[in-house]
């Protein structure tokens, strides 16, 4: 094997090491190694300022000899680590006979704001042999209730001195706020609880408190604002101290959307902070934001706006303004406003945005009065600049995703977003600067206004890639360069559009949480990144944004405030929770969202007649070659709405089943069947579309959502194949149809055709954009071509993840890793090797540990390496031309303790595998 060999070698090495260690150790050879990767709720590791007083506990079993599965566990929870494991004062689960090692509910004493909690777990293996106790884990709750806040909202009235933006919108001047305070004793512990109506950066005694980017993030501000907790113990000392906070408009007080929408176009940005200090003598002090603070708008950040960029005037720098020595006599008194109950203050539910990757400039293009720096990767974030300048000159920094054929910046697709930063130099020499309260989508950076006597150097510009602070969750690679580039484009599209919320695009005057884009890409995102907490947090925003009539807005948070809905978009509220549940096994995501799902299905029903939908729809958005030239494509809106009505009813029924709500399950199953019957009667006859335009998507919806009677499904499949054949074996699908294409063709046995569609080089196809130089997924199948240039439409994002939904099929079918039971308790590993591939590999972190699948065809032999994590089982399908040729670890296959034959068919063998690492080989030719 050549692909991901290191993954399997390290797995074997770890296994060998622990076997050796367990043999050699004389400390306690009868006790198993402790559990690992302990987390709470949606994957948090020892969080500070946690949001939930009723967490769940999860862990993984170690990869060691003797640990196949879990037969029992015990969790102990205490208010002090000294009480563990023998004297837990908050909860002792006692020994529970269960294989469950994930999402176990806390059932102890009530927890309260600020409380620090410590916990451990031990498990018993399949032979009832006990493990060591795990290392002590902890979490600390944030301020859970508005009543916990004694601080006030503070700030200056900045609208009066604001400047007009590109759409005559008011841009609020960024504010600088500070407070000097005295502590009489040595500090034992200090917590800073802080948030903003806007975005903030905070420092204490001249030291940055964190490296968070634009906290607290983006939520439905009229319903909820998230708060952040920082441990600032090491930044505070006895005596005089100073806290300083910068605040800018961000999402809260800036314009959003192409229609100049706002959360508040009149309210000035504000901060809310509460510093709680415990002294070594046990006394306490609280420093709160109130009317004793002072502030100014005369700092160096003159303008900061998400769409238009940031302006920094170094002449106005205020050295040491967050230290005790700074003189603020010319600063103003702030205005103070009480915390009310109308807007909920809650600890942040997922990770903040961070600066994650730094890209180097790869090429410089010199112009008469400018230099263009090419990072050779479309990215999202800000530039890090080290540029020589003359005193008083202004450096202009522009951004673009691509260059026009004549070498000029292509910015038509930014629309009204100016996306331009400025730096005004206060002295001669090299300036070092990075914007703070804006972000851009770009590959190219153009500089003008630098010292013309200097020759531009690549080290002048670096790209700082910023996105929500999640880790990778899987990997995929293959023998095909363009398929690997597609995987890279999917990952970079995810990075670029997971900026606190799932955005449609990161560069133009939108960057909003479009629900349709989110629902089609959600499953793929979970293969590539650890984004459960990200999605769970955003789904709370979806719940908070749901209209009283049950409708779900186009975008969440709902800054458009137009009361409109769309089928296929609003259905995010049923699709995402179910997809998350099936990939994590966490019932909690269904419990949280079940009421919303029911309300949405009721809204579907209210906007239908005789079960046929009359709901508005963006439809199969950006379908290629539309007959009417419309962005909404050719598939009937009523057909789409009815299909999603049925699908959401079915998912709600399945959710009710998981939650044990039998009567409601029956109600929604009956509704699904009624809608499906009405769908078929209205739009199909003998499996063929009638009365509306027949499209690939119309058949895909009918088949994927199981809306046809059994006797008509086969004809519908043939009609779909005819539509694909009429398109010269190319797709004709937009946002809603594309994610269903691979699923339906797979289920109908048309694997060769799906491979053909995936590996097509010409428009419309995934490789078409790659052939034009794409490094991210595009909004349109034809956003650009080398022959014809840019699509003339300004709605032409070059970083738009929707068509990256194909990534789900790449993981689940090319390499074959899929759940057979919710949460991967039972795993399917069923790769489908096909030309032009000769190899493919993937890894995936499941709730139980890493699963891996790697195959290669060589000398008419399939080599398949598989990793099955502890506490799971896997059904492994091995394609072969000769079942008698199957070998495992270089030995002829026989039934044994760890591998049992399930089925032996003509072209494949199915085996039930226990946890472990296996190397299969069998005769197979492409």
From Swiss-Prot:
Known function: Alpha-L-rhamnosidase involved in ulvan degradation. Ulvan is the main polysaccharide component of the Ulvales (green seaweed) cell wall. It is composed of disaccharide building blocks comprising 3-sulfated rhamnose (Rha3S) linked to D-glucuronic acid (GlcA), L-iduronic acid (IduA), or D-xylose (Xyl). Alpha-L-rhamnosidase converts Rha-Xyl-Rha3S, the product of a sulfatase acting on Rha3S-Xyl-Rha3S oligosaccharides, to Rha and Xyl-Rha3S. The enzyme is able to degrade p-nitrophenyl-alpha-L-rhamnopyranoside (PNP-Rha) in vitro.
Kindly list the places in or outside the cell where this protein is found, as annotated in its UniProt entry. Cell membrane
Q: Where is the signal peptide?
A: 1-25
Q: Which domain of life is it from?
A: Bacteria
Which reaction is this enzyme known to catalyze? Hydrolysis of terminal non-reducing alpha-L-rhamnose residues in alpha-L-rhamnosides
Classification via Pfam families:
Bac_rhamnosid (PF05592), Bac_rhamnosid6H (PF17389), Bac_rhamnosid_C (PF17390), Bac_rhamnosid_N (PF08531)
Q: Which residues are listed under lipidation as N-palmitoyl cysteine? A: 26
Alphabetical keyword list = Cell membrane, Glycosidase, Hydrolase, Lipoprotein, Membrane, Palmitate, Signal
Q: What is this protein called?
A: Alpha-L-rhamnosidase
InterPro entries xref list: 6-hairpin_glycosidase_sf, 6hp_glycosidase-like_sf, Alpha_rhamnosid, Bac_rhamnosid6H, Bac_rhamnosid_C, Bac_rhamnosid_N, Ig-like_fold, Rhamnosid_concanavalin
Q: What is its main location?
A: membrane
Q: Does the keyword Hydrolase apply?
A: yes
Q: What class of enzyme is it?
A: hydrolase
Induction is noted as: By ulvan and rhamnose.
GO terms under biological process: carbohydrate metabolic process
Q: How does it sit in the membrane?
A: Lipid-anchor
**What are the positions of the active site?**
510, 779
Q: Name one GO molecular function term.
A: alpha-L-rhamnosidase activity
Binding sites annotated in the UniProt record for alpha-L-rhamnose: 504, 508-510, 517, 569, 800
* S-diacylglycerol cysteine lipid attachment residues: 26
> Per the record's keyword annotation, is Iron included, yes or no?
no
């Amino acid at each position: 094997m050549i692909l991901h060999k290191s993954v399997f070698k390290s797995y074997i090495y770890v296994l060998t090491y622990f076997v050796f260690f367990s043999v050699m150790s004389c400390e306690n050879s009868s006790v198993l190694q402790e559990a690992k990767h302990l987390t709470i709720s949606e994957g948090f590791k020892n969080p500070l300022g946690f949001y939930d007083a009723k967490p769940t506990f999860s862990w993984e079993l170690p990869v060691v000899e003797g640990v196949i599965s879990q037969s029992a566990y015990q969790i102990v929870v205490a208010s002090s680590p000294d009480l563990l494991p023998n004297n837990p004062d908050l909860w002792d689960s006692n020994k529970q006979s269960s294989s469950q090692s994930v999402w176990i509910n806390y059932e102890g004493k009530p927890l309260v704001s600020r409380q620090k909690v410590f916990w451990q777990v031990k498990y018993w293996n399949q032979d009832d042999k006990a493990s060591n106790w795990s290392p002590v884990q902890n979490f600390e709750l944030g301020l859970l209730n508005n009543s916990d806040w004694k601080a006030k909202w503070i700030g200056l009235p900045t609208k009066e001195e604001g400047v007009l933006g590109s759409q005559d919108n008011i841009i609020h001047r960024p504010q600088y706020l500070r407070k000097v305070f005295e502590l009489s004793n040595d500090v034992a512990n200090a917590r800073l609880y802080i948030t903003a109506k806007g975005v903030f950066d905070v420092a204490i005694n001249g030291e940055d408190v964190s490296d968070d980017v634009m906290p607290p993030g983006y939520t439905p501000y009229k319903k909820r604002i998230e708060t952040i907790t920082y441990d600032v113990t090491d930044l505070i000392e006895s005596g005089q101290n100073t806290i300083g906070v910068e605040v800018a408009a961000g999402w809260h007080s800036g314009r959003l959307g192409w229609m100049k929408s706002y959360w508040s176009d009149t309210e000035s940005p504000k901060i809310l902070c509460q510093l709680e200090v415990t002294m070594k003598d046990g006394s306490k002090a609280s420093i709160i934001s109130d009317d004793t603070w002072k502030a100014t708008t005369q700092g160096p950040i003159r303008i900061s706006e998400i769409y238009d960029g940031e302006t920094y005037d170094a002449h106005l720098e205020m050295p040491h303004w967050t230290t005790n020595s700074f003189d603020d006599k010319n600063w103003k008194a702030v205005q103070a406003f009480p915390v009310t109950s109308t807007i909920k203050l809650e600890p942040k539910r997922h990770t903040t945005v961070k600066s994650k990757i730094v890209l180097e400039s790869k090429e410089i293009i010199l112009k008469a009065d400018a230099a263009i720096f090419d990072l050779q990767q479309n990215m999202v974030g800000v530039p890090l600049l080290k540029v020589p300048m003359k005193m008083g000159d202004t450096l202009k920094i522009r951004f673009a995703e691509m260059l026009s054929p004549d070498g000029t910046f292509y910015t038509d697709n930014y629309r009204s977003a100016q996306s331009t930063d400025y730096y005004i130099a206060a002295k001669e020499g090299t300036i070092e600067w990075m914007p703070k309260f804006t972000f851009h989508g770009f590959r190219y950076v153009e500089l003008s206004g630098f010292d013309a006597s200097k020759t531009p150097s690549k080290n002048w510009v670096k790209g700082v890639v910023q996105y929500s602070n999640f880790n990778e969750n899987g990997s995929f690679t293959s023998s095909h360069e363009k398929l690997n580039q597609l995987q890279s484009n999917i990952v970079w599209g995810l990075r670029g559009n997971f900026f606190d919320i799932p955005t449609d695009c990161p560069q133009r005057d939108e960057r909003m949480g479009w629900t349709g884009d989110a629902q089609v890409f959600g499953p793929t995102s979970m293969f590539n990144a650890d984004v459960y907490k990200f999605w769970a947090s955003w789904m709370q925003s979806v719940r908070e944004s749901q209209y009283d009539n049950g409708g779900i807005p186009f975008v969440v948070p709902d800054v458009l405030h137009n009361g409109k809905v769309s089928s296929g978009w609003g259905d995010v509220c049923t699709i995402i929770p179910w997809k998350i549940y099936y990939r994590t096994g966490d019932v909690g995501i269904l419990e949280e969202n079940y009421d919303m799902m029911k309300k949405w299905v009721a809204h579907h029903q209210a906007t239908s007649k005789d079960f046929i939908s009359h709901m508005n729809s963006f439809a199969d958005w950006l379908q290629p070659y539309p007959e009417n030239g419309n962005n909404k494509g050719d598939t009937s809106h009523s057909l789409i709405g009815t299909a999603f009505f049925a699908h959401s009813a079915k998912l709600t029924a399945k959710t009710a089943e998981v939650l044990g709500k039998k009567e409601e399950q029956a109600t929604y199953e009956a509704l699904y069947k009624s809608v499906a019957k009405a769908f078929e009667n209205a739009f199909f006859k003998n499996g063929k579309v009638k009365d509306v335009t027949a499209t690939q998507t119309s058949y895909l919806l009918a088949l994927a959502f199981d809306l046809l009677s059994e006797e008509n499904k086969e004809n519908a499949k043939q009609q779909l194949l005819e539509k694909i054949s009429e398109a010269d074996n190319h797709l004709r699908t937009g946002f809603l149809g594309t994610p269903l294409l691979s699923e339906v063709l797979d289920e109908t046995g048309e694997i060769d055709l799906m491979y053909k569609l995936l590996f097509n080089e010409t428009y419309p196809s995934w490789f078409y954009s790659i052939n034009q130089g794409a490094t991210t997924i595009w909004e349109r199948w034809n956003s650009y071509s080398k022959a014809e240039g840019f699509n003339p439409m300004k709605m032409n994002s070059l970083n738009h993840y929707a068509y990256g939904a194909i990534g789900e099929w790449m993981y689940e079918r090319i390499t074959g890793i899929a759940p057979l039971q919710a949460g991967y308790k039972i795993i399917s590993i069923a790769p489908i090797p096909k030309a032009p591939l000769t190899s493919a590999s993937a890894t995936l972190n499941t709730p139980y540990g890493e699963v891996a699948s790697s195959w290669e065809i060589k000398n008419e032999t399939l080599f398949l390496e598989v990793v099955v994590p502890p506490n799971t089982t896997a059904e492994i399908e091995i394609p072969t031309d000769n079942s008698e040729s199957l070998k495992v670890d270089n030995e002829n296959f026989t039934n044994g303790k760890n591998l049992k034959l399930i089925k032996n068919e003509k072209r494949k063998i199915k085996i039930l595998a226990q946890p472990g690492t296996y190397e299969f080989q069998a005769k197979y030719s492409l």
